[in-house]
Amino acid sequence: MPPKNLSEELFKPRFKHPETSSLVRRVRHHHPFLIHAALGGEHSVGWYRTIDRLLWAWRGLSPQEIVEVLSRIAASTSEHTDERLLDTVMGYRGGNWIYEWSKQGALWQQKASQNHDEQQAGHCWLQAANLYSVASYPHLKEDPLAEQAQLLASRAYQQATLLLPGELKELEFAIPGGSPVSGFLHMPPDARPPYPTVLMCGSLDSLQSDHYRLFHDYLAPRGIALLTLDMPSVGFSAKWKLTQDTSFLHQQVLRQLENVAWVDHTRVAAFGYRFGANIAVRLASLETHRLRAVACLGPVVHRLLTDTDLQDRVPDMYMDMLASRLGMSGTSDGTLRTELSCFSLKMQGLLGRRLPTPMLSACWANDPFSPEEESRLIVNSSSAGRLLKIPTSPARIGFDTALRDMSDWLLAKLTL
């Protein structure tokens, strides 16, 4: 008798769970055109989610595997929440986004459990973690199937890091007024503690298990540790809502690093990408004496939060994600836009004045989420600012070169 497919054991077909695109009740714009961002993916006609092939491939997924899973989703004839959108199959079954990516993740998990070579097994576990993360994407609240996929991603990631180079420690941080949060401290294999450390401030559509490549390829070779933390309302930080004090959780963690023996708390920098840059730059303003430097990638700190025309041009999924993080899934566009404007660091008075903290901001031309002036606003607010323009073609080479440049810059600031 053939062994049961692992995905069938983990997730049996179910039909009573809400479909992801139906969770946020907003007016849909159904953009009849293609939206492309080098970081942030491609929003094609016919898809609810933004298809972020570059970032998924950079994390380790093969382009062929990405196409294979997307093809299974696109070919489904099952009932959809919106028949115009391929990735809105209702129920946990073939063709459903979470089902298909989780099924692929389970295949790699099975490969990992059958592989007796530690290094190869570790890479299989990492592939599984990446696939489970895509299954959960964009990680909206009140999506129980996505939450299960997040849990599987975290477990697979912890299994992977047990077998791959370097060491990972899960750290718990007490947070005033609520539940503690957990972060992953990634420690470089060829260095001695206490380590200079980068505090990761990720995008709103990422999990902290998504950042292994940044650590392994860019920070670890430079002897730098990476501390990851889930964004408010996601993963291990799910009990915390995103508020105008966006940096609250990261600030509490930053203040407690002097109690973490493996971290040199006098040599800490922050790395923020997309909305995470909002947190990183805010920390530069509020915790100047605790941060050596801040590096930002495709930052979202002002324009997208205040410009309604720009908000109308980004994918519905992104605006849904913002509404979900803010706990505003059932409010009108007007109310959401008013609230978003309060998240602008310029409106908060935290940008536009000179900060002593060195800040680097990297950007792409014609980025729909982060115009170049967003990065200029950041670097002009630092007494030691630097603007880095990333070539859009070839995209992967430009991305890799930028990350190496940013890592060298961080190392220089951390070793002054």
From Swiss-Prot:
What reaction does this enzyme carry out catalytically? a carboxylic ester + H2O = an alcohol + a carboxylate + H(+)
Similarity-based family: Belongs to the FrsA family.
Looking up NCBIfam families in the UniProt record yields: PRK05077.1
EC number(s) stated in the UniProt entry for this protein: 3.1.1.1
Q: What is this protein's record name?
A: Esterase FrsA
Provide the top EC class: hydrolase
Q: Please list the GO terms describing molecular function.
A: carboxylesterase activity
Species the sequence originates in: Erwinia tasmaniensis (strain DSM 17950 / CFBP 7177 / CIP 109463 / NCPPB 4357 / Et1/99)
> InterPro entries, per this entry?
AB_hydrolase_fold, FrsA, FrsA-like, FrsA_esterase
Q: Supply the Pfam families for this chain.
A: FrsA-like
Q: What PANTHER family does the entry give?
A: DIENELACTONE HYDROLASE DOMAIN-CONTAINING PROTEIN-RELATED (PTHR22946), ESTERASE FRSA (PTHR22946:SF4)
* UniProt entry keywords in alphabetical sequence: Hydrolase, Serine esterase
> Briefly, what is this protein's role?
Catalyzes the hydrolysis of esters.
